Amino acid sequence: MDLNIGRMPHGSRNSIADVSGVRVGHCTVDDERHKTGVTVILPCEDDIFRNKMPAAYHVLNGFGKTAGLMQIGELGTLETPIALTNTLNVGLVHDAMVEYMCRQGERRGYAVSSVNPVVCECNDASLNDIRHRAVGQAEVFAAIAAASADFAQGDVGAGKGMTCHDLKGGIGSSSRLVEIGGETFTVGVLVLTNHGCLHDLTIGGENIGKAIEQRIREDTPDEGSCIMIVGTDLPVTSRQLGRIIRRCSVGLARLGSYIGHGSGEVMVGFSTANRIPAQGDCLNFRCIHESHIDDAFRAVAEATEEAVLRSMLEAHPVTGYTGKVRRSLGEFWQP
């Protein structure tokens, strides 16, 4: 599927997994009452706890319950995989991630006494009986075991019960290639979309949401959240990464989201280029010159816009536990 968003080239997979070492796994819970799940992003194949990554976060609108942001803000590092799930499952998924990291430490010969799992959420209660908290340790471990560079998008994992612009949302991903000083780097974005209202949906400058709205007669406030995970192999500091990930908001705005009161827009980014050992003295890091950062800004904006669209186009129609139906964008629009 070629959406032809922007002007920058994308990677071979056109996903966050174009960043070497990054893998994504899902576990979907899909039965009569539950349309939910968990998605886990593994930033590397080695030990991220003992060799951390530069990281940053940005909250555009803070109506959310994401866990793990405070330490990223203070230390500027990521030390665990990143999990995505529904709002009421954050606690159980966080506990599962702690257990996973403790087991990884034991397997590698060290004890974990403090760890900072990052667990992001959106509220899928319109389709999922969220009170049951159907995602636990077994589902988290299954998602991790299923992690691959080639992963499904749409209504899978954490995206199973999500709604985007009053249509079916979910998991989407895209990437862009950035050339600096003769070297080619990758910026990848993965989104969990659960935001926006149909009336505002705009693609390529055309407000297609109005036409779709006349056919399905549904429009609700812009609320519900969007999680944006940015992975890159650009050699950047935590501060530079923070500047880059803030441009995810451009991609959301180009599709018509105005970031409503009840919507939680959270961005988390990591770079695989520099690793930070758990113990050490003085460290030497390579980072791009600020004069070259504009291309990274454009890359993350384009990749976010495309990732959101992919989350909708790859999703199938889903009927929730109360009978509510979320239609797929693909029923009304194709690139």
Regions found by a protein language model. Name each.
Residues 1-335:
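Alpha/propeptide regions of enzymes that mature by internal proteolysis
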